[in-house]
């Protein structure tokens, strides 16, 4: 309750145009560049804070100017909002230089990036060589958050009330904002403990700090506070549901602004009853992904609660069908009235680019189908007005929306007859290799004649300044295509030559011509568009500009064959063709919303299938189709996993199954938990898979080994390349370290299964790290071969 015990509710007879969060990086990546200048020493703390405050004020004014009544504050984090929450709550592990009070920037960035021995870190008492907090995906988005590191008996304290500080900063600009903070149950659920205890056991210790935050906001006359609890979109055990009741029952008993509990990224499902019963003043629901439960929400949420209806897609770049969204709002209003309705995006706009107006090179027809964060605010405001005043005041917006929807629906470029016919002609046989793995392996070994523990790399070599400058020069017209091709060929020649000198068994061409493992392919496929300023935050200062899949996908010409075939012509050793898989291209793009994702993925798979066939015809004996995002595509709810895994596996097989038995299909996956999807990994039917295992010291191989005897082969039937070099670190591992890791792998796998390779591609490493590390890798494989050869029952490959 607010001070004095009087329960406040904002009084209105109209609906409210609301927003849950705004992109924090800036339309031209201002925050990214400020961070990088700060880290390089070219900007001091005051300059960094000033840049962030300028951007924050600009965001607030923009939202007010677009007609948003509930403007969020506290959503701009310097690195990550979950890290901000942990620091605000005093959840800072020992060694990072915090002993009380506000967490310093040195400590904050040491938690985010690891300690680097800088003068600022030394002055703050930060231990050298500390790792960054673990980073993982924010639900099923392409944003990454830092995982709070807690322990049993963790003490929490309010180091600084960030929501209050941001609320006051907005008030100084005459903007009455709605503070945003991550809720206590989601914070704990998303955390990990160092001792294996359940983070939710810390709820009792955490709630007093949240109560203090809310009390101070109430004392500052904040009308509303938005508390995000996105874990309500997950499968929750009963303990977590009870934790919600305890948390909000406790917080409701103290002074607080009106609480809007926000869920997003999916329907509430079986958590609807829990959410509807909580003693809060409003509930935000995702009616884009959770459209099917609209009537259930209307029935379940008490009439005296506010409902925030997320009808504008906050996760994708497509223009809203305003007429359909307005009909949804009107149906809810017919049941509840407009007195306590908010119109909002489905989630924070963090996940979309800032402003479509900056895109001057997009095809006009495609541009008309899109809406970025700025434009989505206009849609929210128009819908709120249409709900209150009817269609007449927004007839211009409705007409423009109708025209865009109609043009997109009727476009022959979006819906291609030839692509539809080809999809319809896909048969089961097209998704099966000609023979089972044992027969394929025999044919491949006869062709390749590889030794035990064959060595290779994952694909890319360092993208040096010279490589990037050549690509940029070609793009700007400062370098001719002929000269660019000459440089690429020279780099490939060098890479082939020194790989041979090192003694690697299966070579790669280095991917010097490629800018990005998705963009490179998307630029050569029909149905893709690319932006100039379509940046979204991946984590910290890292931003990505995902391709936009706007129409049916097809491959008009070979994409990689030229340089792969050239590389193979320079050596007698087997060369790998390198492709990105259909699931990963799908996951790392903005995907069209007018057909199922499965359909789009199948279209991409057919394009990759054509490329695989051309690589095989060009003489490439090994073709690697990378799927690092395979697990990322899993739906939030386990009941939906089976359907996703079925079509994801089918798409990989469609892309790779045309080849002869003697052609080896490899795939690569980055660090992931494989135990719960192991049958699907095996069902992909690749001849070899390479995975990141260095940091886990081969523990990830347990999923592949199953319950088979040590060294006897496991549940994964094919070959495996467990990474023996952590390429995310500049450190060069020794031969003996790699031998030790491979020995651990031999305890889980049969010798014939094991490939020797780095964890991942080497694009971000330097040559002075790559050459000695690969020398040690080859030496480690040779050492194991010698050990095996000395054994009395030495196996053949």
Identify the residue ranges that each predicted region occupies.
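Domain-level signal for soluble alpha/beta catalytic cores
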Residues: 6-797
């Amino acid at each position: 309750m607010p001070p004095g015990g009087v329960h406040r509710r904002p009084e209105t007879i109209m609906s409210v145009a609301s927003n849950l969060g705004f992109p924090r990086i800036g339309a031209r990546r201002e925050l990214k560049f400020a961070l990088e200048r700060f880290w390089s020493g070219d900007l001091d703390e005051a300059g960094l804070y000033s840049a962030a405050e300028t951007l924050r004020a600009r965001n607030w004014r923009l939202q007010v100017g677009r007609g948003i009544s509930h403007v969020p504050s506290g959503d701009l984090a310097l690195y990550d909002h979950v890290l901000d929450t942990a620091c605000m709550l005093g959840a800072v592990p020992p060694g990072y230089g915090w002993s009380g009070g506000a967490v310093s920037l040195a400590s904050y960035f040491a938690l985010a990036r690891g300690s680097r021995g800088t003068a600022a870190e030394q002055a703050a008492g930060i231990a050298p060589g500390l790792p960054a907090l673990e980073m993982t995906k924010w639900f099923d988005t392409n944003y990454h958050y830092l995982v709070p590191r807690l322990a049993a008996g963790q003490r929490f304290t309010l180091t600084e009330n960030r929501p209050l500080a941001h609320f006051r900063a907005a008030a100084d600009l005459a903007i009455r904002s709605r503070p945003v903070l991550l809720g206590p149950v989601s914070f704990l659920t998303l955390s990990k403990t160092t001792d294996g205890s359940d983070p939710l056991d810390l709820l009792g210790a955490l709630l007093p700090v949240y109560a203090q935050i809310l009390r101070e906001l109430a004392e500052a006359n904040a009308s509303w506070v938005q508390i995000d609890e996105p874990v309500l979109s997950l499968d929750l055990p009963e303990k977590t549901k009870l934790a919600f009741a305890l948390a909000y029952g406790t917080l409701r008993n103290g002074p607080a602004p009106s609480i809007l509990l926000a869920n997003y990224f999916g329907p509430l499902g079986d958590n609807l009853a829990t959410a509807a019963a909580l003693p809060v003043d409003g509930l935000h629901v995702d009616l884009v992904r959770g459209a099917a439960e609209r009537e259930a929400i209307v029935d379940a949420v008490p009439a005296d609660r506010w409902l925030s209806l997320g009808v504008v897609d906050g996760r994708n770049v497509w223009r809203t069908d305003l007429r359909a969204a307005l009909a949804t709002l009107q149906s809810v209003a017919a049941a509840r009235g407009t007195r306590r309705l908010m119109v909002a995006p489905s989630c924070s706009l963090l996940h979309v680019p800032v402003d479509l107006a900056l895109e001057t090179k997009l095809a006009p027809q495609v541009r008309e189908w899109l809406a970025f964060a700025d434009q989505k605010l206009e849609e929210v405001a128009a819908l709120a007005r249409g709900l209150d005043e009817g269609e007449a005041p927004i007839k211009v917006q409705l007409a423009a929306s109708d025209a865009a929807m109609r043009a997109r629906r009727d476009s022959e470029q979006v819906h291609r007859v030839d692509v539809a016919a080809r999809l319809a002609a896909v048969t089961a046989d097209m998704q099966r290799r000609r023979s089972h793995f044992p027969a394929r392996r025999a044919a491949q070994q006869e062709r390749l004649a590889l030794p035990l523990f064959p060595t290779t790399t994952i694909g890319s070599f360092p993208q040096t300044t010279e490589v990037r400058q050549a690509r940029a020069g070609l793009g700007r017209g400062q370098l001719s295509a002929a000269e660019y091709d000459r440089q690429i060929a020279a780099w490939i020649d060098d890479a082939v030559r020194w790989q041979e000198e090192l003694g690697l068994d299966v070579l790669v061409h280095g991917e010097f011509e490629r800018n990005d493992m998705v963009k490179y392919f998307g630029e050569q496929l029909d149905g893709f568009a690319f932006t100039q300023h379509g940046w979204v935050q991946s984590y910290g200062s890292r931003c990505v500009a995902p391709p936009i899949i706007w129409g049916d996908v097809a491959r008009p010409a070979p994409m990689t064959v030229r340089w792969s075939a050239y590389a193979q012509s320079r050596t007698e050793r087997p060369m790998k063709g390198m492709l990105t898989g259909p699931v990963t291209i799908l996951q790392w793009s903005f995907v069209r919303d007018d057909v199922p994702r499965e359909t789009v993925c199948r279209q991409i798979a057919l394009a990759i299938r054509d490329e695989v066939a051309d690589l095989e015809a060009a003489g490439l004996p090994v073709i690697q189709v990378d799927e690092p995002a395979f697990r990322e595509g899993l739906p939030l709810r386990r009941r939906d996993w089976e359907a996703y895994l079925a079509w994801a596996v089918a798409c990989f097989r469609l892309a790779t199954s045309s080849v002869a038995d003697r052609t080896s299909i490899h795939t690569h996956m980055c660090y992931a938990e494989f135990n719960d999807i192991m049958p699907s990994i095996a069902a992909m039917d690749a001849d070899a898979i390479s995975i990141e295992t260095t940091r886990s010291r081969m523990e990830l191989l347990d999923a592949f080994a199953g319950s088979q005897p040590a060294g006897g082969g496991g549940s994964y039937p094919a070959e495996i390349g467990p990474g023996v070099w952590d390429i995310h670190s500049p450190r060069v591992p020794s031969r003996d370290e790699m031998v030790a890791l491979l020995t651990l792998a031999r305890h889980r796998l049969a010798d014939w299964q094991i490939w020797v390779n780095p964890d991942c591609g080497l694009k971000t490493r330097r040559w002075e790290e790559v050459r000695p590390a690969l020398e040690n890798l080859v030496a480690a494989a040779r050492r194991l071969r010698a050990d095996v050869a000395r054994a009395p029952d030495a196996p053949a490959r």
